[in-house]
Amino acid sequence: MKRVSKPNFFHTLSRWFSLQFSLLAICLCCLIPSEVKAADNWKAGLAKTVITPETGVWLAGYGSKRTPDGKLHDIWMKALALKDNTGQRAVLITSDFQGVPKSMSDRVFAQTKNKYGLARKQIMFTFSHNHCGPRLGDDLYDYYPTTPQQDQLVAEYTDRMVDKTVEMIGQALANLSPARLQMGTGHTTFAVNRRNNREADIPNLLRSGKALVGPVDHSVPVMTVTRADGTLDAVLFGYACHPTTLSFTKVCGDYPGFAQVELEKNHPGVTAMFVNTCGGDQNPLPRRKVELCEKYGHMLAIAVEEVLKKPLEPISPGLKTAFEYVELPYLKVVTRADLETDTKSGSAIKKRWAARLLKKLDQGETFPTAYPYPIHAWRLGTEMLMIGMGAETVVDYSLRFKREFGPGTWVCGYADDMISYIPSKRVWLEGGYEGGSNLYEYGRPAYRWGPDTEDLISASVHKLVKQVDLKAD
């Protein structure tokens, strides 16, 4: 009869430890995939470049000659490239420009497609609408009492900015590396609806504690880019307000510039990026002092910091982008008789505009009856929807689309093309500066948009949002 040996104590102990180690490894694998999976599912790349003018290019945004005589800080253009786990790519550009005209952005889009294979729907070129930044191309051309020498400086600067933008996009794409995307929302209150509150009354109203009136959007959407090791690499944030605190001759980024400077100082190595979320009828009030500009920048930075202190919502994998132009009709295209009358206007801007358009008619040109308006929809995971809209959209658009599409919706104005104010139906019916007969200031061959502007934009946005629905795939 064969003798059966008893199990060795040390052998049993060794097997027990081996089992425990295996169980521990399994548990750890279950605990850490949030960062590991995020690193596998998203890649992000960053790049930035200084855009502070080195020549006498006038500052943009007000109808006068403003030659810069120094700076409070440099102004920037920044790029965030994204790539999901299926290879889909997109690039968001933020900048401290007042306005990027179509004549400039189209050059960027064409070169980007040729060099990097990015389609029009994959790139969004936003500008903060900062009024202490340089002129670009033919943006607001009739606004300024310009000269041939100034035109040459602007053309040369614009050419350099096209080259810098394309190069920066390439750098961001080259820097794509594993990342985790998260988001949250903050709040700050310095934006005031300028249509419903007289600027001169604001200080007394604030001191008395009386409520200001009119629609506002005081939310501060925030998205972070974190690397696989937990290092914060970028903070993208938005706010709906004109960067018009200052109107002097020093280069700076106004309140968004101060907010970005503060965030990057607080978080060394981090890239802070700002988008203007439909601030067409919103002003930082009171204003016109550097101290107030610094204060508003600090308030915005604090709102972002408060978000960073809280648990953020992870953005799941998946990237889908859509884009189209929607033709926005003018109410009435100007005639030769209209322009001849306007050459006698008391407005210097209108006189310059009328004279320029009369030359076009003399050369045999006919004016279009509508303008191609750019609209984007980007879906990041199932959590975040970014709607990009051209030019100076009023706050009604942000409030409407966030209500219709729910939490996680960003509505960015000032994208791709500085066309004019884009009124909602409410603002169009009320008239006034943002909704009335002021398209001539932007060089358009008309005084006013048609009454169905909001309806046309809304229909396009809803169509594009359906196209980027990840759940439909």
Say what each PLM segment does.
Residues 32-38:
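Sec/Tat signal peptide C-region and signal peptidase I cleavage site
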Residues 39-126, 130-271, 277-278, 288-298, ...:
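Conserved beta-alpha junction segments in alpha/beta enzyme cores
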Residues 282:
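Catalytic histidine-centered segment of alpha/beta-hydrolase-like enzymes
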Residues 18-32:
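Bacterial N-terminal signal peptides
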Residues 1-17:
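N-terminal secretory signal peptides that target proteins for export/translocation
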Residues 301:
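Charged, flexible cofactor/metal-binding loops and thiol motifs
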